[in-house]
Amino acid sequence: ELDEAKAVMTRVKANLPVSESKLDSLSPEFQVQIREMQALMKREAADSKGTCKDLPKGKPEEWLPEIVAEHKGRIVFVDFWATWCGPCRTGMKEMESVKDSLKEKGVDFVYITDTSSDSNDWLAYVARHEGIHYIVPEDKKQAMQIPNYENAIPHYLIYDRKGKFVKAISGWPGVEKMMQELAAVQ
């Protein structure tokens, strides 16, 4: 039951829904703790810049196309990263300085990490970085069929307004280079 409670608590911390039947399956002690955490997370979510979302239903190879399709009509910047990755954190921090101007030009930011990231650290990043945030089971990441991905992060993908893959960038190239790549997309 402890593993189930931990899994539920991870969803609560990510501000993701938990079914009543799932809560009811836990002991009363866990239910009280989880409901208290839900109330706390609801209050904190109001201050968060980012939004956590569940992965789309279906197979891992369907996740990325479905995520991108949700942003049709906008340029999509996908950032594969982890909390323990220094260059990933640097890239996220440096992109904050240009994010508002990019959003005005129609760029949406999607962040995808995996379960190798510490969940508390991940939630802290979600709170500070506006965009849509997903967490993928580490063993499913390869099955996502990420374009030009060679198991190294940071890894960035750019999609055009029609949802067509345009470019993959491995490693943090700096804000100026990233701005050039995004400006080239219509």
Outline where the language-model segments fall.
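Conserved segment of the thioredoxin-like fold in thiol-based oxidoreductases
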Residues: D100-K141
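Short pre-active-site segment immediately N-terminal to redox-active cysteine/selenocysteine motifs
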Residues: R74-V76, F80-W84, A152
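Oxidative protein folding and maturation machinery
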Residues: E1-G73
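Thiol/disulfide oxidoreductase modules built on the thioredoxin-like
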Residues: T90, E138-A183
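Conserved redox-active cysteine motifs that mediate thiol-disulfide chemistry
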Residues: F80-S97
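A structural signal for short secondary-structure junctions
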Residues: E70-K72, L102-E104, Y125-A127, N148-N151, ...
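Conserved hydrophobic packing residues within short motifs/helices of P-loop NTPase cores
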Residues: V78, V110-I112, L157
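Short, contiguous acidic/charged loop-to-helix segments that flank catalytic cores in large enzymes
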Residues: G50-L55, I67-A69, A82-P87, I112-S119, ...
